[in-house]
């Protein structure tokens, strides 16, 4: 593993102060004239790039070159519950087809479970070249040991170059366990995936609190793993004439044995599913107090929308955590989302920027939300929202209200600002 070596003879307090000012993680300590790198270091390498010369050296393990030609194909893990395929699987198949086209690789789907062979035909209709099926009675319920063993067995036999996994409860448990077995890279919650011609998968996601978009590449190991949330990508159209085939796989029974026995499955009650909402009204710091949410809920009810929030709404205790949009919440892709008093930081934008139509209301004309909004209204939401409510209800229901004038819209090729 890479590490930072300190050239002790070139260290003094002035050097420490310079490094401490550069390091965003406060990962340097200086005691008894001794400089040390603490466990807080994230290997961002900022100190190596901008720190004093002759003080720090990057020590890296010797890299063993891997023959990437031995690994072929982009595999999508099929996430399902009792044969009901999670829609994130189809979205990943669409992205896998795009990536595979760059390097001329086939697209595979890995399906494991009990009595699920017939589901392979459904996967072929989305343009998969081959579906590998492990249909075993021991795989009826998701139990981590046998499922991880099956994925490992598949990798050993097929040698895929990349494996795309949905960021579901199952995917987040399975992918890291198997990636650790191969000591290979895994990037969680990717928002963008790109492919290099040398088959390196470029995995892009916000990092360091959303301040940068990190491009992560697994250069020296295979297979490459990543997880992606539901609604980040778009599912492809079904093909009229599927061309792929199905291969039934076998595995040693000993690998399907687990110390865990499922005694009973208790289905969770269906709760809030923000990711399926077609119209959303999202509120941010611009909402001053909880009482003001009454007006917002009234507006949302008028247009048939679900009310959601950014992280401050959760921290204030105003919303259920399942209603948060963003990196630490849900990813959504509604037909319409109206952002009220939301600045549009990367943490929030990453969870909704693929929405079909985005309307933003914010008092700051330079707010980042306007960079992704299709229509923006610059102004106080406490003035704009009542006017919108009046327009929706109609003048006959608001006889005491003065005539409302809405500023003329200035239209740009793709976006509109009011």
From Swiss-Prot:
Record GO terms (molecular function): 4 iron, 4 sulfur cluster binding; electron transfer activity; flavin adenine dinucleotide binding; metal ion binding; oxidoreductase activity
Assigned GO CC terms: cytoplasm
Stated family: Belongs to the ETF alpha-subunit/FixB family.
Summary of activators and inhibitors of this protein: Activity is stimulated by divalent cations. Highest stimulation is observed with Ca(2+).
Phylogenetic placement of the source organism: Bacteria, Bacillati, Bacillota, Clostridia, Eubacteriales
Protein name, UniProt field: Lactate dehydrogenase (NAD(+),ferredoxin) subunit LctC
One Pfam short name: ETF_alpha
EC number: 1.1.1.436
Cofactor(s) the record lists: FAD; [4Fe-4S] cluster
Subunit structure: Part of the stable heterotrimeric lactate dehydrogenase-Etf complex, which is formed by the lactate dehydrogenase LctD and the electron-transferring flavoprotein (Etf) alpha (LctC) and beta (LctB) subunits.
Keyword Disulfide bond on entry: no
Coiled coil: none
